[in-house]
Amino acid sequence: MVNVFFKQQKFVIKKRFNDFNGFDIEENEVLWFELINPTPNELATLSQEYAIHYNTDHSQRVSSVTKYWEDSSSVTINAFFTNQDENETFHTEMATFILSNNILFTIYYGTLEIFDSIQKKVLASPKKFEDGFDILTKIFEVYFEKGVECLEWINKQTSLLRKNIIFKETSTHDDILVRLSNLQEFNVTLRDSFFDKRRIITALLRSNKVDSDTKNNLNIILTDFSSLVESTTVNLNSLDNIQNLFASQVNVEQNKIIKLFTVATMAMMPPTLIGTIYGMNFKFMPELEWQYGYLFALIVMAISTILPVIYFKKKGWL
């Protein structure tokens, strides 16, 4: 599927095509070609009509993530975007950006929510978009905003997880470990994605194909992404602290269990010793012939069990 955005007077118009059938828009009017899950025919038409080369080998595309290169007529960028899903999971998709003759070509497979937001902004504010570089800059701006939202969500979940551990709420240890691992993975993935955008923007700033106004905007966005990278570092430290807190709590609980069994073992040693003595079956043991010998032995065993427990409590070991 191909979405085409083109200027018409003071407006930006969006049209959808399949395999470019019925495409009759002048090239100088086009701002953006958005190819979503493109077919081989669509890619072939793109290559033939606009001299755009796109690597159809998925494994090579993945290995080219975050790479930037340009030739005399075009700029090609491979970048990955992290998208948070509704059920608090996330996924990462790669997108290819090609800038040629001031037209932006985006090619991606799967779903990326950020492009829905970009479409709305382009259609709502047509005066802000004169060429493909303006749209690419807006994509970085919107991704920055999405990144801020994701980091705020991570920060909120981190705070809730800390309270859950400290106040020992209903979550099991397995649940806490899963939540902690997911937050760490999400944060690291976002961090890598922000680094990715910084490298791309830095490369664009060195290009002579980018005009001065666009470079000024990119400089601001570069600073914004640097601040996001710092925020991910803060989140990583907070999550590491929570992990240490959780490990300490588990150790305390294990120590309590070990202490309980140790006290129980120590408390049972005296009565065990008494029972062992009376179980020696020596021929001359006065208590064996005594009428109350059995009751006496039970009382002594009970007292020898209770006394260590009282002693441990006074020492604060229980």
Curated annotation (Swiss-Prot):
What is one term from the GO cellular component aspect held by the record? plasma membrane
- List where this protein forms a coiled coil: none
Transmembrane regions listed in the UniProt entry: 260-280, 292-312
SUPFAM superfamilies per record: CorA soluble domain-like, Magnesium transport protein CorA, transmembrane region
Kindly give the membrane topology term recorded for this protein.
Multi-pass membrane protein
Query: According to its UniProt record, where is this protein located?
Result: Cell inner membrane
Marked site: Essential for ion permeation? N255
Q: InterPro entries, from UniProt?
A: CorA_cytoplasmic_dom (IPR045861), CorA_MIT (IPR050829), CorA_TM1_TM2 (IPR045863), Mg/Co-transport_prot_CorA (IPR004488), MgTranspt_CorA/ZnTranspt_ZntB (IPR002523)
Q: What is its main location?
A: membrane
The record lists the catalysed reaction(s) as: Mg(2+)(in) = Mg(2+)(out); Co(2+)(in) = Co(2+)(out); Ni(2+)(in) = Ni(2+)(out)
Keyword Transmembrane helix belongs to the record = yes
Q: Which UniProt keywords are listed?
A: Cell inner membrane, Cell membrane, Cobalt, Ion transport, Magnesium, Membrane, Nickel, Transmembrane, Transmembrane helix, Transport
Q: Motif location (Probable selectivity filter)?
A: 279-281
What are this entry's molecular-function GO terms? cobalt ion transmembrane transporter activity; magnesium ion transmembrane transporter activity; nickel cation transmembrane transporter activity
Q: Does the keyword Mitochondrion apply?
A: no
Q: Name one Pfam family in it.
A: CorA
**Which proteins does it associate with, and in what oligomeric form?**
Homopentamer. In the absence of Mg(2+), interactions between subunits are weakened, and dimers, trimers and tetramers can be observed in vitro.
Q: Which family does it belong to?
A: Belongs to the CorA metal ion transporter (MIT) (TC 1.A.35) family.
Q: What is known of its domains?
A: The central ion permeation pathway is formed by the first transmembrane domain from each of the five subunits. Mg(2+) binding strengthens interactions between subunits and leads to the formation of a symmetrical homopentamer surrounding a closed ion permeation pathway. Co(2+) binding also induces a conformation change. Low Mg(2+) concentrations trigger both a conformation change within each subunit and a loosening of the interactions between subunits. This results in an open ion conduction pathway. In addition, this results in a less symmetrical shape of the whole complex.
What this chain does, per the entry, is described as: Mediates influx of magnesium ions. Can also mediate cobalt and nickel uptake. Plays a key role in the adaptation to the low magnesium conditions predominant in the gastric environment. Alternates between open and closed states. Activated by low cytoplasmic Mg(2+) levels. Inactive when cytoplasmic Mg(2+) levels are high.
What is the protein named? Magnesium transport protein CorA
Name the species this protein comes from.
Answer: Helicobacter pylori (strain ATCC 700392 / 26695) (Campylobacter pylori)
